[in-house]
Swiss-Prot record:
Part of the 50S ribosomal subunit; part of the 5S rRNA/L5/L18/L25 subcomplex. Contacts the 5S rRNA. Binds to the 5S rRNA independently of L5 and L18. This is one of the proteins that binds to the 5S RNA in the ribosome where it forms part of the central protuberance. Signal peptide: none annotated. The gene is rplY. Belongs to the bacterial ribosomal protein bL25 family. CTC subfamily. Transmembrane segments: none annotated. One of its GO terms (molecular function) is structural constituent of ribosome. Residues 177-196 are annotated as: Disordered. This is Large ribosomal subunit protein bL25. One of its GO terms (biological process) is translation. It holds the Pfam family Ribosomal_L25p.
Length: 196
């Protein structure tokens, strides 16, 4: 997993401060670690957007103006429901030997049988919650869809984790992750015959 540097500035929590920051392209954030006091910071919205909307997960070195660096990952991101802009982020610190839970993006490999028949791949979960040591965390979890046919679904319990040493998926086993939807014409015909 790649490590990315991200500049942060300490901030004082005051009334209306967050709205003022956001207006200037700055996102309020907090840094926390078990048993330690939460630290309020701010981060550049453009730099944060690149990380949040990346197809891979990252370890993040939070760099303060005084030269101090803290190793972390993004634990939570809040979006504005109207504009979809990031309005707040939580960074979690960790030790190298500490088991953590991270959101890791899903990637697809293979040419699906269902797609060759005209179906469409639907990614129902774009990220999975993975538990393990930070050093073992992958950039993404790759799911082979070669044998996935029309109407079939891959659930969390069906994702092989053999290639990912010491890692576990923490999402519910029955959670659907990927499916193949029939072509639009077929789906409309099924709806009409069910209604008829």
């Amino acid at each position: 997993m790649e490590t990315i540097a991200l500049g942060v500035e300490p901030r004082v929590i005051r009334k209306k401060e967050a709205a003022k920051l956001r207006k200037n392209g700055i996102v309020p954030a907090v840094i926390y670690h078990k048993g330690e006091e939460t630290v309020a910071v701010s981060v550049n919205e453009i730099a944060l957007n690149k990380l949040v909307h990346s197809a891979e997960s990252h370890i993040i070195d939070l760099q303060f103006p005084d030269g101090k660096t803290l190793r972390s990952f993004i634990k939570d991101v809040q979006f504005d429901p109207v504009s979809d802009r990031i309005i707040h982020t939580d960074f979690q610190l960790f030790a190298a030997d500490e088991v953590v839970e991270m959101e890791v993006p899903v990637a697809i490999s293979g040419d699906s049988i269902g797609v060759e028949k005209g179906g469409k791949i639907l990614i129902l979960r774009h990220a999975l919650t993975i538990q393990g040591l930070p050093a073992n965390m992958p950039d993404h979890v790759t799911i082979d869809v070669t044998n996935l046919d029309m109407g079939h679904i891959i659930h969390v319990r069906e994702i092989p984790m053999d290639a990912y040493t010491g890692l576990s998926i923490m999402d519910e086993p029955e959670t659907p992750v990927i499916s193949i939807a029939p072509p639009k014409k077929d789906a409309e015909a099924e709806t009409e015959s069910a209604a008829g």
